[in-house]
Amino acid sequence: MTDFSKILDKARELEAKMKESQEKIKQIEVVGSSGGDAVKVTLNGDGEMTNIHLSEEILKEEKGIIQDLITAAHNNAKSQLKSKTSEEISKA
């Protein structure tokens, strides 16, 4: 086998691993929370918000507090997603 053939084989192998990682990343789901779990935000592997949960107690709070808690929960989920995505890519 020539050096060029070895390089091509390695490239194909790496491409297959990256595609596999991308598929696994799409399956990731993370839940970020804030306010002692009063607010929970779920993100999928593409970073899209798929769910938001607000406890009954939190709905009694002022609008600004609720907005801050939603933002914090989203940022928490985004941080988790970034970590899990990096972890998955490093396996490739």
Put a short name on every predicted segment.
Residues 62, 66-81:
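Short, well-ordered alpha-helical segments
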Residues 36, 71, 86-89:
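Juxtamembrane/interface motifs at transmembrane-helix termini
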Residues 1-31, 79-92:
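Long amphipathic alpha-helical segments used for membrane anchoring, targeting, substrate engagement
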Residues 31-52, 58-61:
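N-terminal intrinsically disordered, cationic/polar leader segments
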Residues 2-5, 26, 55, 59-60, ...:
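Generic, ordered loop/turn and secondary-structure boundary motif
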Residues 11, 47, 70:
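Residue-level signature of catalytic and energy-coupling elements of molecular machines
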Residues 33, 58, 67-69, 84:
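Short, charged/polar low-complexity linear motifs in solvent-exposed/disordered segments
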